[in-house]
Amino acid sequence: MRVAFVTTIDDEAIEDDVDLDLEKLAFAAAGLELHLAPWEDESVEWTSFDLVVVRTPWNYVEHLPAFRRWLAGLDATTRLWNPAPVIEWNLDKRYLLDLSSRGVAIVPTAYIDSVAEFRDSVSSIETGEFILKPSISAGSRLTGRFSVGDPHAESLAMQIIGAGLIVMVQPLASSVDHLGEIGTVVFDGEVSHSFRKGPILASGGELIGGAYREDISPIRAPDDVLALVREASAVATDHLRAMQWMGRDEELLYARFDVVRLDDRSPALLEAELFEPCFFLPTDPAAVDRFVTAVLARLAG
């Protein structure tokens, strides 16, 4: 059977894909014919594949209108996972509001679209530092960590608003500096593996070391973190089914949930990535086989 991974023609955007080599080997071993298909390539016949899996279209933020047109223009017979309406919902991090309204603990987040609102939001932060980013972003683009009163924060907020985007303001969870984030990958509704993500952002709007580098290591996620991940996964799936963006009995093919500990030590969801997450498969030798099993089940369905 023929499976397409949706990727991009921008080689630089995907040069840090740590999953692909393992995926190629595992798919071949399972007898699957894997093709890398850039979303920008108009010659690709998406309906010719038995399954189309969105994996690394990591330049979509810079080409958002075109990416959305591509997504909307896919033939209804294309077997796309995760489905196009799910991707459209997950593009904008305001999806956190949907999860929070259904009881999922999230990192406190203000969504603002004016400088005046930004000033009011920052003035209420008690932790001393906060994270600022657009609601549509990837790879820490237009993202910064700032102290309250840092003028560079307002400059970044103005840049985001000027680009027609919504600004997200989140009080810094100080645990990130020593505990990092815990990412957990779910395949076909079942937890696969977890990993630790070290801090990336330095105070003052800079990146640690001056460049975007992810510090990833394997970890056994604590029970309370896994409980939150399972809750978030179930709530998201129920919401997507209720919206009729997935079938009544369908699971997401894949998802990744990033969790931090708040200053009261409770876990809180930072992001739920449902369409282009890195799985960091090298952190668990069995993870790639779980992914292939999920793909095979989807092909058999």
Roles of regions detected by a PLM:
Residues V52, L80-W81, V107, I131, ...:
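Structural detector of well-ordered beta-strand residues that form the stable sheet scaffold
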Residues D224, R230-G301:
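ATP-dependent carboxylate activation and anion-phosphoryl transfer catalytic cores
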Residues L99-S100, E126-T143, L165-H178, F195:
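ATP-grasp fold ATP-binding core
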Residues S147-A242, V260, A268:
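Phosphate-binding site of ATP-dependent enzymes
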